[in-house]
Amino acid sequence: MERGKMAEAESLETAAEHERILREIESTDTACIGPTLRSVYDGEEHGRFMEKLETRIRNHDREIEKMCNFHYQGFVDSITELLKVRGEAQKLKNQVTDTNRKLQHEGKELVIAMEELKQCRLQQRNISATVDKLMLCLPVLEMYSKLRDQMKTKRHYPALKTLEHLEHTYLPQVSHYRFCKVMVDNIPKLREEIKDVSMSDLKDFLESIRKHSDKIGETAMKQAQQQRNLDNIVLQQPRIGSKRKSKKDAYIIFDTEIESTSPKSEQDSGILDVEDEEDDEEVPGAQDLVDFSPVYRCLHIYSVLGARETFENYYRKQRRKQARLVLQPPSNMHETLDGYRKYFNQIVGFFVVEDHILHTTQGLVNRAYIDELWEMALSKTIAALRTHSSYCSDPNLVLDLKNLIVLFADTLQVYGFPVNQLFDMLLEIRDQYSETLLKKWAGIFRNILDSDNYSPIPVTSEEMYKKVVGQFPFQDIELEKQPFPKKFPFSEFVPKVYNQIKEFIYACLKFSEDLHLSSTEVDDMIRKSTNLLLTRTLSNSLQNVIKRKNIGLTELVQIIINTTHLEKSCKYLEEFITNITNVLPETVHTTKLYGTTTFKDARHAAEEEIYTNLNQKIDQFLQLADYDWMTGDLGNKASDYLVDLIAFLRSTFAVFTHLPGKVAQTACMSACKHLATSLMQLLLEAEVRQLTLGALQQFNLDVRECEQFARSGPVPGFQEDTLQLAFIDLRQLLDLFIQWDWSTYLADYGQPNCKYLRVNPVTALTLLEKMKDTSRKNNMFAQFRKNERDKQKLIDTVAKQLRGLISSHHS
């Protein structure tokens, strides 16, 4: 029963579900009925549902039938009416068709026109859109064209600015166009191209600057020279209120424009062509020579591109290389001044450029970099000058070099470079200059001394007299009173040497100019150099003349006279130096001239040479002596050679009248002593082994001739018999042997007032031995004669006693 109730309940639920599904089918769109039918198939009551569905369809059919039956009459009436209007409708259709055909025929052209109008409208719209787009793209294209033009004309920095505007302002507005994408892709290449081209311009500029540094430096040094000349004029003609030019005014003005509208400034390589100006026109400034726009452009371009440090490093590296090239002097620089000038011009040009870059750019170069380069340049320049100047043997070239170095230093000092080391080096070159002057003046003195005739200067008129006195400070009242013609006591080399000493002093003074030295330093330099000239150069020249083999007594006498007058002129040289340096001789540490010593030494050397020369002449005469030491004849006159010798001495001493008295007296005494000594040696020489009393008698006549010459007073100033004392040894020796006064000699020997005080026992024994041998040889039978035997015994006895004196003296 319960099962039946459950079946009934299920049947009711199924029926309700089917009813719901049917309502849903009726109310749902056919396209969406699938899910509803899916629920039916998912169930198990398909048959019942179909029954329900058929039942529902039948119900609807009945309702439709009822409705149709209700409206059937109206439908029939409507059909009847429709049939009635069908003919009219056909007529209307025909009319409409005909009208349409006519309209189609008539509107065909209109349609074509409308189609054309449509196309025109479309074209107009496209043109308008195209114009709008072109107006948007045109600035981009114009900027790109401008960029190309700027690059073509090498206006790289403006081109870079244009490229920035193009990239950041214009291209973003039209970035969807394909050509813009091409431009965007090409921008890095353009930047690199600008970078490369600007670097190429910089390289051209650097190369051109390197080649034209000579011209730049020459211009700078000319301007420095003009400024110095102007300052000298101002100093010589001071004016109230005048102002010295500032350092900045002395700078060379450069063209500092970064951009220029002229094509020339855009295409230059750094150097502009300048025609040579006339000498009397203003020296062109460096703004007429140099355009630094390539440097500025490249610097700005690299700064904009973020590569400024790369540019700075490259620029400094290249300039360092160029500095090393500039500082390397040519091997033949020392041969001409132009070699030094070109070397200095290049260095000045280099640093003028760097100084300008320092003052016109922000950090491209800095003071530390400039100072480093200058230190290197200074050391290399000084080393090069030391090396090459040492080859200079021409003092004029050394002087010109000094002036060039001073101008070089002054030029760089204007630009703020320290140049003290250059002036210190000039002091070294000053010593070298002094040496070259000494060598030059050695040749001058040699020529003067070689060409001199060593004769007093004759003058025949007042003009000639004044001319000589004007050349050499000489005053002699007695000579002035003498009538013309007359002679100066000195020869021509005296005024010539004196004037050359003054010329040397002038030459030394020239070197000291512009060295920023005090008057005391200049005076000290001149005095030291002059002392070297006197004590070394002139002294050597005089000594060489004095020591010449062919020098004569007349020349030596004249040299003594000349040096005496030159010695007196030293005080005038002191005054001359004082006048040109304005430093009084009494100033502390003032160096004194050593001219007096120089001329005294030369005079003493000449005196010694006179003595030597006289002795040599005496020796030459003595070589003519031809004594017959074995003669038994007694002569009655002096030997011929001695007579000639005495005549020579008389004529020689007659020339000594202008010599100082002591010199003539010393020469005469020296000659007599040498003659006496030579005669004594002649008498005692070993080759003369034997001699006779007759030979001694002849020798005695010769000695008497010498004594007669001494008594005649060949040179004034000797006291009575003073000159005869030169022959006293010979006289006493000869008297001893001729008078055979041995008893007196032996008895008085050793006493202060001995008659034969000057006779040495050794000398007496030597001569006695020669006479003893002669006596034995020539008197073979003398032993048989009592007188001869007694004489021989006496000789032996005297000889024995002499030996005793000698031995006692030695003991």
Swiss-Prot record:
The keyword Transport is annotated on this UniProt entry: yes
Renumbered residue ranges of the record's region Disordered: 260-280
Family under the similarity heading: Belongs to the SEC15 family.
Stated name of the protein: Exocyst complex component 6B
InterPro entries for this protein: EXOC6/Sec15, EXOC6/Sec15_C, EXOC6/Sec15_C_dom1, EXOC6_Sec15_N, EXOC6PINT-1/Sec15/Tip20_C_dom2
Origin organism lineage: Eukaryota, Metazoa, Chordata, Craniata, Vertebrata
Pfam family, one: EXOC6_Sec15_N
Disease: Spondyloepimetaphyseal dysplasia with joint laxity, 3: An autosomal recessive bone disease characterized by multiple joint dislocations at birth, severe joint laxity, scoliosis, gracile metacarpals and metatarsals, delayed bone age and poorly ossified carpal and tarsal bones.
Coiled-coil intervals, chain numbering: 50-119
Keyword Protein transport in annotation: yes
Gene: EXOC6B
Gene3D superfamilies with a match to the protein in the record: Dsl1p vesicle tethering complex, Tip20p subunit, domain D, Exocyst complex subunit Sec15 C-terminal domain, N-terminal subdomain
GO BP of this protein: exocytosis; Golgi to plasma membrane transport; intracellular protein transport; membrane fission; mitotic cytokinesis; vesicle docking involved in exocytosis; vesicle tethering involved in exocytosis
Subunit structure: The exocyst complex is composed of SEC3, SEC5, SEC6, SEC8, SEC10, SEC15, EXO70 and EXO84.
Organism the protein comes from: Homo sapiens (Human)
Domain of life, source organism: Eukaryota
GO CC term (a single one): exocyst
Keywords: Coiled coil, Disease variant, Dwarfism, Exocytosis, Protein transport, Transport
Described function: Component of the exocyst complex involved in the docking of exocytic vesicles with fusion sites on the plasma membrane.
